[in-house]
């Protein structure tokens, strides 16, 4: 692993772009709606379905597990893999922590409301409207939510996720300094130039969409 070299190739306006995105997110009233789901609740924790508004006014959803015993608890926020089916936290164990499992826009619990088609290619010709701009902001809104809850110990908010969830974990931890730790594994959506040279998928989908949109590969990479 020490021999792997991947030069930095971020755009000059990278941080300005994400700072503006965070500013726009902060202007969206979250309108949290928290509904107990009795069939998912158990002996140790209650499980709730949460709805909230994210960047661009998009409604996103997730499952929130809270120990029945009163107290302040650390929170683990889980970001899901690409097209993964949303699972609920186990309500009969892990009484030492809260858990929030987020479905980003168009995926998981939000699949019935998906307007993005092939998520990772949506808006590929315009970084302002690219799918993962909003999806990355969804990860921050999830952190906003857990920190808004009285049961949360604000000193101990942890992020984790694999594949797409690993990428979302890295993005959220980079953009939000309120978190205490992050555990990404097999992260997807990174180092695209090398990635697409090594394996066919999903580069073949991106290349086909670039042709469909009439943009060059370099323009595509600038969005990514």
Task: Describe the role of every protein-language-model region.
Residues 1-45:
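N-terminal targeting or regulatory segments adjacent to alpha/beta-hydrolase or S9 domains
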Residues 166, 170-219:
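Hydrolase active-site cap/lid region
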Residues 131, 163-167:
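Active-site loop->helix "elbow" adjoining a glycine-rich segment at hydrolase catalytic centers
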Residues 221-224:
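Serine-hydrolase catalytic core
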């Amino acid at each position: 692993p020490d021999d792997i070299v991947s030069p930095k190739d971020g755009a000059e306006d990278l941080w300005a772009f994400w700072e503006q995105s965070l500013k726009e997110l902060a202007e969206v009233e979250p309108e949290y709606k928290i509904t107990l789901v009795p069939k998912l609740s158990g002996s140790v924790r209650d499980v709730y379905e949460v709805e909230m508004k994210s960047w661009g006014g998009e409604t996103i959803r997730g499952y929130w597990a809270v120990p029945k015993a009163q107290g302040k608890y650390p929170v683990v926020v889980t970001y899901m893999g690409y097209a993964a089916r949303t699972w609920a936290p186990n309500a009969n164990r892990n009484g030492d922590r809260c858990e929030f499992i987020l479905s980003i826009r168009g995926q998981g619990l939000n699949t019935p409301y998906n307007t993005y088609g092939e998520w990772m290619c949506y808006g590929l010709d315009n970084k302002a409207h690219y799918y993962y701009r909003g999806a990355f902001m969804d990860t921050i809104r999830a952190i906003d939510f857990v920190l808004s809850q009285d049961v949360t110990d604000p000193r101990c908010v942890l992020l984790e996720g694999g594949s797409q969830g690993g990428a979302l974990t890295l993005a959220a931890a980079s953009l939000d300094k309120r978190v205490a730790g992050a555990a990404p594994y097999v992260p997807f959506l990174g180092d695209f130039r090398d990635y697409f040279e090594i394996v066919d998928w999903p580069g073949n989908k991106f290349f086909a969409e670039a042709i469909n949109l009439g943009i060059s590969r370099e323009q595509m990479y600038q969005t990514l």
